[in-house]
Amino acid sequence: MLRFTLNGTQIEIEDGENRTLLEYLRNVKCMKGTKEACSTGHCGACSVLVDGRLTRSCVTLVRRLDGKAVETIENAPNDTMLQVIQHSFLDVGAVQCGFCTPGMVMATKALLLHYPA
């Protein structure tokens, strides 16, 4: 049995889980904020945090998450830092079409966690 947290909630799944974190988030948990674009880990639209580190969910297998903490854009209502980042993006018009914005918001949080102001 694999155990990890997803936005603060404990998750338990079978060890044989062979799907990517992106597939798990979108298809099992119905969390559509994390997007799929390149499917190779290059574009960043699928970015989430794993133990506070920026991670491309399209190339990360769920079976590698045992004991880890995963945070997605869906955690924004519970996370003041994500809320401030989202509002900052809106204030300067940094949303473009919005498709990859969740990944950019998560990347910004990772940057600020590792290089606080």
Q: Where are these predicted regions, by residue range?
A:
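Signature of N-terminal electron-transfer/Fe-S-associated modules in redox systems
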Residues: M1-A117
